[in-house]
UniProtKB/Swiss-Prot annotation:
Keyword Methyltransferase: no
InterPro entries to which the protein is assigned, alphabetical: IspD, IspD/TarI, IspD/TarI_cytidylyltransf_bact, Nucleotide-diphossugar_trans
Name of a matching Pfam family: IspD
Chain positions of site Positions MEP for the nucleophilic attack: R151, K205
Catalysed reactions, semicolon-separated: 2-C-methyl-D-erythritol 4-phosphate + CTP + H(+) = 4-CDP-2-C-methyl-D-erythritol + diphosphate
Keywords: Isoprene biosynthesis, Nucleotidyltransferase, Transferase
A molecular function (GO) term: 2-C-methyl-D-erythritol 4-phosphate cytidylyltransferase activity
Top-rank taxon, per record: Bacteria
Descriptive protein name: 2-C-methyl-D-erythritol 4-phosphate cytidylyltransferase
Protein's pathway: Isoprenoid biosynthesis; isopentenyl diphosphate biosynthesis via DXP pathway; isopentenyl diphosphate from 1-deoxy-D-xylulose 5-phosphate: step 2/6
């Protein structure tokens, strides 16, 4: 079965507090985005990798690839106005049947086991997302104040989120709404169920300077 992955890297990295978008920042001497691509290539060297980048960042990425002698094969799609539109642009590069994952470009520490688990489960479940347990106490904000909620009723969602190709393409024909916070929410809007599989806690989304410090430890 053909495997594809759309790696979305359209963030400006404003919470990092610097001028360089977070997906290009070095971790362990190599840009984050290269490590993310390598994680999927290590799982399946024949996987079709589609990188979604804003047009304004594509020349910079190509320069980085030359500087770091990064030659892993991948297509580049144009980033859109929102994540939804970026994924939709990436889907245009996916041909035929098979499975397609969507992964955050700034999650370089996804494990081989999680990638394998998502794609394997999607062969029968068609829509799969990795999750991890909530370990902190969770409070729900209300008009009077806040209240504790049972944390066992909640999960933290990660990527890659993996789907049967035609299912995800059909889902992305829907009109965009701001309720679409990830790919699972787009598929669920059609009334389809999403299967949960175990993620890995190291699969953090690098968003803040503190996250980069954690990343250096994880290398």
């Amino acid at each position: 079965m053909n495997r594809h992955v759309i790696i979305v890297a359209g963030g400006k990295g404003l919470r990092m507090g610097g001028d360089i978008p977070k997906q290009f920042l070095p971790v362990g001497g190599k840009p984050v985005l290269m490590r993310t691509i390598e994680a999927f290539y290590a799982f399946d060297s024949s996987m079709h990798i589609i990188l979604v980048l804003p047009v304004s960042q594509q020349a910079y990425w190509k320069d980085l690839c030359e500087t770091y002698h990064f030659a892993l094969r991948h297509d580049i799609a144009d980033g859109g106005e929102t994540r939804f539109h970026s994924v939709k642009n990436g889907l245009a590069y996916v041909k035929g049947e098979g499975l397609v994952g969507v992964h955050d470009g700034v999650r370089p520490f996804v494990s081989r086991e999680v990638i394998a688990g998502c794609y394997e489960a999607a062969q029968t479940k068609q829509a799969v997302i990795p999750v991890i347990d909530v370990v902190e106490t969770v409070r729900h904000l209300t008009k009077p104040g806040s209240e504790t909620v049972p944390r066992n009723d909640y999960k933290l969602v990660q990527t890659p989120q993996v789907f049967e190709v035609q299912l995800l393409k059909e889902a992305y024909q829907q009109e965009y709404t701001d309720a679409f916070t990830d790919d699972a929410s787009v598929v669920e809007a059609m009334g389809r169920e999403v299967c949960l599989v175990q993620g890995n806690r190291e699969n953090i989304k690098l968003t803040t300077p503190f996250d980069l410090k954690i990343a250096e430890v994880l290398i």
